[in-house]
Structures are given as structure tokens and as C-alpha cells.
Amino acid sequence: MTVYKQRFVLDTTAFTDRGVVDELGDGDLCEAVTRLLDLIGRARMELAISCYIPYPTVYRELKGFLERNGCPELLSRIDTWIVKKTPNRYEVKVPARLFMAYVKDMRERLDRGRKRAEKAIWEAALEAYEIMLREEADVPKERIIREVIGETVRRFRRKYRQTVRHGTLDSAPDLDVLLLAKELDAAVVASDEGIERWARELGLRFMPACSFPDMIEEYLRMSREVEG
């Protein structure tokens, strides 16, 4: 039987997505990664499906996740079943139109982030002023820092991240996933709105991380039926 050799480039979220961890590991990241590697290994041996991970950027991210969750020994299995490759950043061509669109998108996001910062400053100043008006005695500096500045900074960080980083490419690993997929004519596997959006812009196939294990299992099941 002739098998079309499919290629997939995996982002860190292909392993750490909450849906994947719950489905394959019942909430345990190490168990989920183990079972996903089992599927990837079988798919490679039986169907000639190849999975890649950008090196060193995404590989380093994934290594950190495994070490923090107490299963660094899984790196040897990742080295066995997943191809580590550095994207050819000098040869992969990206249309100038997409580059301009990305710059425009980031400029708009930074502008919205600046407005968020200005609003946070005004809110903090107003809250501090209202506290001092309510109190007849001098207000301790520590109280202003605790009740006003600290809370304002926490709110600002959350809103700034959502405004500037959510839904776009905000790191070198994200970009490497797309560049490697384009270089290899491979599908992207991730659970990241920014990667998904720009994968579409580049004309790349995209597979949600939560759907990837089921797809591999279906391929394996159908292969057994055809051969049997």
C-alpha cells in the first residue's frame, strides 16, 4: 500500500494543551506526553508520518516544561521519535505583504497597549488621591503601594498581555514553528491563536493540538483495517 508521507511541525502547546493533557494523561502532563509519544512512534513506524520540532527554541521550551513537571527523562524519547531541526531562516521566503501586515498589526497593538498604560496611571493617581481625601491623617506610603499601585500593576499586566500579545506571534519559538512548517511543507500542530492565525496567512495546514492525537489514532485504525 502506498502511503502519503505526512509531516507535522509541533509547537510546545501540542504537548501542553489542557485538552491533550486531560484526554491522554487524565490531568498529568508527563503521562500525556508519554502517550502522545507512543502514538507518534507508532505513526512513524507504521505510516511513515514524521513529526518535527524547531531546535533549539521550541525544544528548549518543551524541555523546561518536562523538567518543571518532574519527567526530564522523556527528552530521550522525544529525541528518538521527533526530528529536531533548525528552520532555514535565510532561505525560507515570506511574502512582503505578510511582513507589512504583521508590522501594522503590532503597531496597532502597541498603540492600544500605550493607551492601557495611560489609563492605568490615571486610575492609580485617582485612587491614591481619593484615599488621601478620606483620611484626615497622613496616609502611610506602604498603604498606597499595597492598595493602589500593587493592584493597578496587576490589572495592567493582565490587560496589557491580552491587548498586545494575545492572538499574534510574540516569541521566537512561535515564528520558528511557522518557518519550519513552510520550509518542509508540513502541517502545524499547536494550541495558540497567534500561530493559527499566521499559519492561515502563510497558507499552511493547521491542526489544533487537541485534535492531533485523535487524528493519529484514526490513521492507525484505518491502516489496520485496510491491511487486514
Curated annotation (Swiss-Prot):
The lineage of its organism: Archaea, Methanobacteriati, Methanobacteriota, Methanomada group, Methanopyri. One of its GO terms (biological process) is tRNA 5'-leader removal. It catalyses: Endonucleolytic cleavage of RNA, removing 5'-extranucleotides from tRNA precursor. It comes from Methanopyrus kandleri (strain AV19 / DSM 6324 / JCM 9639 / NBRC 100938). RNA-free RNase P that catalyzes the removal of the 5'-leader sequence from pre-tRNA to produce the mature 5'-terminus. Keywords: Endonuclease, Hydrolase, Nuclease, tRNA processing. The keyword Nucleotide-binding does not apply. GO terms for molecular function: ribonuclease P activity. HAMAP family: RNA_free_RNase_P. It comes from the Archaea. Belongs to the HARP family. CDD domains: PIN_VapC-like (cd18691). This is RNA-free ribonuclease P. InterPro entries: RNA_free_RNase_P. Disulfide bonds: none annotated. Its EC number is 3.1.26.5.
